[in-house]
């Protein structure tokens, strides 16, 4: 057996920085070619995010409207299909729209299995089935696809681990810059928990207030036997998924994810990762509402944490997962990381995204955390993740 790993990165405009390393890149760089204790081979595909190559205007357009998302999903699927043999373990990682890519890839595998090499010419049929013909989640099996299209796949393939940082499904298009309806063409991707997944981990940003970067949480129902962990961390989108030059805060969710994947068998070179004993709970966070997204400073969106509602006022907005009819969806196994509890109501620095330098210090509090820390109280231990 071997381990087949796909790492899907975000886009350049997720953090406003085109050069700093994300957590996806750092995980990919830390993966051993072989597992030292049992000699298991590990092969890795790293996919740069859409909008990260070409001329600047090309990157702007591609990154903003999500061109290339479909291509990345199909490319990753081809890589897995060309290398997979029964018994292999599959690990998927993603950040931002790369997380959306990784979760969509998991949905494609769950719906169609992994096409056998000699049947890869049927990938367009698998894509069509997943894109436009798939029944409601959890009401299908790969056998439905195989029968319909008379093809063959590894229909019982499983995804050992799916680790994502702050999934963005709405593509992050600045309002008025590009057609608002563009995001709807990506709505077909199945980003709910899928039956082919064994363990899913999702790191979420408490302090991301851009309306077009609202997260896509995993929501009920979850298939039997699928373990889901969704944990909230301090900071903006790039403080959780990486990508800022000042990145000490992003090391916390990176180490959390690395440990979870390692527990499921992934072999990592910890000399390429932060030392777990050196993490800084009071490291600077970032204000992502700048540049193209400066309008969000005047009309911030607050993410609901642990499904605890709170009052917003003026131009503030609250985001909670809803279905197409506006009904609240039940999220799966949300917790708050212990580092957040350690930081709350303590002085901490805030960095400017434009200059990426510390410009101020303030007591760390957040409107969406206020229901969790009433008065001088603290969170129940059951709601805290390590």
Please describe what each predicted stretch is.
Residues 1-386:
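Active-site- or binding-pocket-proximal scaffold segments within functional domains
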